[in-house]
Regions:
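Low-complexity, Ser/Thr/Pro/Gly-enriched N-terminal "stalk/linker" regions
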Residues: 1-47, 70, 74-85
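Aromatic-lined, polymer-binding surfaces characteristic
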Residues: 40-211
Length: 211
């Protein structure tokens, strides 16, 4: 088995255990157990909803054992629908604190859900795709209208580029914000070859940025 596929196989149950699969719960589909399960937080970290990306890849690679395909598809569906419930009115989502309006996490969740749509194309109905696009459209709108306010953080900006480029591809849109964000990355790139992360180079972040 491919080493990356093996890692996915070894961790898929851990990923599945994040999600609230009680369809009678108000937090059905939420992925932050500290919020929906242990109740030690008063907000849900939206980053974890992005696990649908990995679940869709795992489904495509057929690495699930002991699970019906329909069950995995419903976990993914509930997690994507939950994004709508945890999104703010301005289209943003949070990671670290209420009202965060996180550019990076909003872009990341948009990219991950859109990636799931891409990988599951043949398993989704037209109505499902339209519903998912309706959920992600406000997130794309947020990262179109707002920037990364903390600093020049190239990996955050690159996440926005990836999200909008994939949105344009799947939703047949012509949003040019991806090119604007990419230009900011290039304008702040070092002559030594590294991309700016806050005040300098960061090999770890550069790995994520170039991915």
């Amino acid at each position: 088995m491919n080493v990356y596929k093996q890692v996915l196989f070894q961790n898929i149950n851990k990923l599945l255990s994040l999600y609230n699969i009680d369809n009678f719960s108000n937090t059905y589909g939420y992925a932050d157990r500290e919020f929906w399960g242990w109740k030690i937080k008063d907000f849900s970290n939206a980053t974890l909803q992005g696990g649908v990306h990995s679940l869709s890849i795992a489904l495509k690679l057929n690495v699930f054992e002991g699970y019906q395909k329909e069950h995995i598809l419903e976990v993914i569906n509930s997690a994507i629908l939950a994004v709508e419930k945890i999104s703010a009115k301005n289209g943003s989502v949070v990671e670290a604190y209420p009202g965060e309006n996180s550019f990076c996490v909003t872009a990341l969740v948009a990219f991950d859900v859109l990636s799931a749509i891409k990988y599951l194309d043949n398993d989704l109905t037209v109505n499902q795709k339209d519903k998912y696009f309706d959920i992600i459209r406000p997130l794309v709108g947020f990262i179109t209208k707002h920037g990364e306010e903390h600093a020049i953080i190239s990996n955050h900006l690159a996440t926005g580029v990836a999200a909008i480029a994939l949105w344009n591809y799947l939703a047949n849109d012509i949003n040019s914000r991806d090119k604007e964000l990419l230009q900011i990355i290039y304008d702040n790139k070092s002559d030594e070859g590294w991309y700016l992360e806050y005040e300098g180079a960061d090999p770890g972040y550069q790995t994520l940025c170039t991915y």
